[in-house]
Every structure is written in C-alpha cells, then in structure tokens.
C-alpha cells in the first residue's frame, strides 16, 4: 500500500480546472491502486499561515525558550511535515497566479522545507532527504506558458522538489484556459488525457 498526499491550492471551489484534474486523478488512481491511502489537504479551506517570526522562533530556539505562540506554530509545521514524510506520492494541484504558484502553496512549502528533516546541509552543499518519493503537479493556466520565460511555476517547483530529494516529478499542464472557448476545452481535454500515464 502506498500513501498519496494531495495538496489543493486553488482559491476557487467551483469552476476550478486544477480541482477538476485532481478529482479525475483520484478516480483513476483509486481504480488502479484500490488499496492505497489518499489524504487531501485543501489550502483554500484550511489556509496555512505564511512564514512568520513565531515559526522561525519555533525552529531555532531551544524548546525551553519557546513561547506559546512559537510552540503552536512549530506544532503546525510538524503536522504538515509529518504528512509529507509519510507520503510515497505527493500531488500538488496548482493554478498559475501571476506566472507562478499560489501564495498558499508557497506557504505550505515554507512549512515543510525543514533543515535536518526534509533536507540537510553537508560540506558539499544541501542534500535532499526525501529520496524515493514521487511528485505529480497538476497545473491550470490562463495562457500558454510551458517552456516560455513566463513560466515561473514548473522551474521553481522542480528546483524545490530536487532540493528535498524528489527527482521523479511529472507535470501535467492545462493551458490556454482564458484564451477562448476552443483553447479552454482543448487545454482541459489534453491535460485529462495525460492523467492515465501518471495515475
């Protein structure tokens, strides 16, 4: 049995293409892997606080010196990190907002990129500690950005995943969604057609 962690980050509940892709992905994954355990964390329904002084203090101070607010922030970060550590497959559903990922997804990443837990510093540089895991990224984009200089989403997420040791990363892009009805339908259909290859 494998554990799949799905991170939803679209601000929209209705008419969200990234959520449509997630729904279809779950159906196909469950059909192919009925014994697997799937956990969904929705960052729109339960937002993760952005990085702040309390979390930094919780990370850096000895336990006896942490304030109540720092302990609370650390406990939240530990919960998110433990979910990631337990997962065999990470799925991030990410619409493109202003050429990159939603700030809610960035906040989640800030909580789980943890020195000594998901990566470590060595004499030769940082080393990812989550080797052996797989990541799948489902994106929804108003324009067509794949391979273009305007894409600050895929390169960033590939870099972050590699930093924590995840090198097996697949991207499925639904693009051109705001260009016209024809482009929208084509973009959604092409993305959905690729789901079977990763599920």
Swiss-Prot record:
Its EC number is 1.6.5.-, 1.7.1.17. Binds 1 FMN per subunit. Keywords: Flavoprotein, FMN, NAD, Oxidoreductase. FMN binds at residues 10, 16-18, 96-99. Belongs to the azoreductase type 1 family. It catalyses: 2 a quinone + NADH + H(+) = 2 a 1,4-benzosemiquinone + NAD(+); N,N-dimethyl-1,4-phenylenediamine + anthranilate + 2 NAD(+) = 2-(4-dimethylaminophenyl)diazenylbenzoate + 2 NADH + 2 H(+). This is FMN-dependent NADH:quinone oxidoreductase 2. One of its GO terms (molecular function) is electron transfer activity. Its cofactor is FMN. It comes from the Bacteria. Quinone reductase that provides resistance to thiol-specific stress caused by electrophilic quinones. Also exhibits azoreductase activity. Catalyzes the reductive cleavage of the azo bond in aromatic azo compounds to the corresponding amines. It comes from Pseudomonas putida (strain ATCC 47054 / DSM 6125 / CFBP 8728 / NCIMB 11950 / KT2440). Homodimer.
